[in-house]
Structure formats: structure tokens, C-alpha cells
Amino acid sequence: GGVPVFVDIRKDTLNIDERLIEDAITPHTKAIIPVHYAGVACEMDTIMEIARNHNLFVIEDAAHALETKYKNQKIGNLGNPTAFSFYANKNITTGEGGMLVLNDDFLADKLRILRLHGISRDAWKRYGKSGFTHWELHSPGYKYNMADINAAIGIHQLKKVDRFFQLRKKYASLYDLAFDQISELETF
């Protein structure tokens, strides 16, 4: 039932302009969702301070920032939760799917139930070594769980994260060099 309120981006990073966030906050605001775009981290110290001052959640969108760091700390350690995407055009791929990281056991348990159509136990637990166990439908839910084959692809892709990152940096520098002589184009 939430209504998104958009905040403009910074020209130098293409990320949310943290200086404009407070003007967009209303009594109905529940969360700030910074998007770390193209491997560039948002100004998280400022965003977290604004969130604390207004008692808001911070949900980090790190779909394009798997290897990104903010002040030498991996993205995903500040907001709660942080969402990563592993779609085909992301930093690594599983074909479909993604990952949430969070530091809140209550929220993690709730999200685990929601990801399986509101069912209390997944198939591995229902049909594991101990045999069939009963499950309950706790609430309406969604189909957010990743298939095992996609997870296996992701585990293999994780081994290549550093190499993929170095290749993207190399290609970005080639674009910078190619566009350097065109005054109408600005790269960063």
C-alpha cells in the first residue's frame, strides 16, 4: 500500500541526491530506498543519519553493486534489508533470482514464510531425513524462493566476482578514453 516518492539523483554518481531526501519526507514516509547504481555507493552516512532522525527504515537496493564498498565496508551492512539481484544483466547471474541480506531475525523469519507462498516449511525441510513433516499456511505469500539449479549457478558465479569486476573497470576506462575527446559527453 505504499506510495513511492522519488528524489532526484546526483549528476556525479547517478545515485539518489542525499541533500534532497529530507524535503521529500512526509508524515507517511516509512523508508528510504537508496539505489547503489553501477557499482557506486550512495552517501550512506548521510542517509542513515536522516533515517535515524526521522525513525525510518533504510532498504538498500544493491542490484548493481555486489562488490561495491562504502568506506571500506561491503554494501549490505548498513540498511536492513539489502536486496541484490542476480538477473542476467547484473554483476553475476543465476538467470533469475536474487538475495536479501539482513540483521533482524524476526524480519528474516517473516520473509522466509512470505517467499514460499506463506507456507511455514520449504520442501527440503518437509521431505528431509526425518520424513514428511506437516506445514502450515501462515499468510498469503509470494514465490520468491530461488530454484536449486539457479543457486548452483550463482555459487559458481561467485568464484568469478573479482574477475568480472576487473573486466568492467577495464571496459569503463576504455569508454572513458574513447569519449574523452567529445566535449558534449561527460564520463565519471
Spans of model-derived segments:
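Glycine-/small-residue-rich active-site loops that bind phosphorylated ligands and cofactors
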Residues: D12-T13, G39, K90
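Structured binding elements
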Residues: G1
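PLP-dependent aminotransferase class I/II
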Residues: D8, R19, D23, A31-V35, ...
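Hydrophobic residues in beta-strands of the RecA-like P-loop NTPase core, especially within AAA+ ATPase
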Residues: V35, I59-E60
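Short, Asp-centered acidic motifs that coordinate Mg2+ and/or phosphate
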Residues: K30-A31, F57, P81
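Short beta-strand-to-turn element immediately C-terminal to the catalytic PLP-Schiff-base lysine
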Residues: F84-S85, G98-N103, I155
